Amino acid sequence: LQQKAFAYLHQSALDEYKEILKAQKDGVKFTGVSGSILQYLYLIAISGEQVPAANKAAYTYYLSKVGELLTSPSMDTKAIAAIVLDKAGRKKEAQEFVASLKEHLTKTDEQGMFFAFNENPYTWGGMQMQAHVDVMEALEQTGGNTDTVEEMKLWLLKQKQTQQWNSPVATADAVFALLMKGANLLDNQGDVRIVIANEVLETVSPSKTTVP
């Protein structure tokens, strides 16, 4: 099934490449790559899929254009581009994307690290949760960002506490991110103490209980 899926993706990417070459002959200029092609490159990067001989020229062309996405306002686009470049051995270019992503992060003691955009999240790269998780994956895959990833996990947990993860997809994304390498925050339950009128409701973590 995977082979059939990749066969379809390879053919689609090749067809798009041929259309680009045709348009370029007519003077049309292209910047970056389309969203579908970026996803195609990402799947190759994370799966280790071998690029067919017929697609080599197309793949090389697409890869050469990924760096032009550095000016994109979309955080998840930059995150995916960083992974693609890193896996392709273009470490320096990948780190430029990582640096750009980090520049947009905000940090607070309570919330950890997150993107504090005031605009509608759709204007800066899709659903906020998805973009946050995509960036976490990029930082994890490119290495050397353990502390930042852990801080970003904290924001995910705070979202669950304050407003819930807003869809099954968001929930899956969040759980995937929380189970990345590093501290498993899902195991760290902690204690909760709530006072309602004169009544105290309190949970106690297992580490604080004693066996008689």
Which sequence ranges carry the predicted segments?
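Large, well-folded core regions of big proteins
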Residues: 1-212
